[in-house]
Amino acid sequence: LSRGLGDVYKRQGWEYSNGMVADVDAIRYDAEGRIANLQTLGYREGLHKLSLGIGFSDVVRAAYRDVGTPWGYTLWAGYDLNPENRNFSDLVSAYARIYTPGFFRHNSLSVAAAYQTSVGGYRFPSGLRFLGYKSTRLLPRGFSSSDISSNNYLAGSVDYQFPLCYPEGGISGVIYFKRIRLNVGADYARFQEFGSRGKTWRDIYSYGGDLLLDLNILRMSAAATATVKLSLYKPSEGSCWFGFGLELPF
């Protein structure tokens, strides 16, 4: 269930989820400090996440051939907690993105930064740190939330986007191919992990690009443009990451 209040430029609200959460109070440990009853731990119902957030965004409307807004920015801050079980740590997170024109006409450059960290200390046992909350607003592409820790997590991202061509044709009344564009991006993140040697810093990064096809389907207006997106990124750990997506105008 979620609730929000705002207009085009300013948004603020709260959100909570009510479902199944691990019963951390029932955990038992063996003589070596490992969880002994993980397979039979079980779950319980109840409110297990409350999210508070506030954001502000202001952008300039893009021209017909622009690949993105020429000027703009987005700011957001959030706070996540578990009011039903205070064994969990809270999460503070912030995000910002700036949009500027590129080096050539109709190009676009955007730079983003994010920060998140757990507060209140790990009140639950160290073996359960994986249950802590994490923000996914800015993850290096090719990584997931399971690859990071929300301890002094700092991330940055740079994207440069430009048009390749404008087919401006298709099958009348069925599909209209508007534009093919390319986005080149790079991401970096640094955060702290807890191990046998205490706190250590870990760095991850990725780089690659996205091929995007803008199209209109079934006589939709020019403003109602859908986008087919193909992504290929090389993360600093593991093999190449490939993604496919469809962005709809609603």
Regions found by a protein language model. Name each.
Residues 69, 149-152, 174-180, 201-205, ...:
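A structural signal for short secondary-structure junctions
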Residues 12, 16-32:
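A subset of solvent-exposed loop/turn segments in beta-rich extracellular surface proteins, enriched
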Residues 1-9:
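Single conserved hydrophobic/aromatic residue that forms the stacking wall/gate
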Residues 14-18, 90-92, 154, 205:
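Transmembrane beta-barrel architecture of outer-membrane proteins
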Residues 7, 15-16, 116, 190:
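Long, low-hydrophobicity, solvent-exposed regions enriched in small/turn-prone and acidic residues
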Residues 27-184, 192-194, 244-246:
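C-terminal outer-membrane beta-barrel translocator/porin domains of Gram-negative envelope proteins
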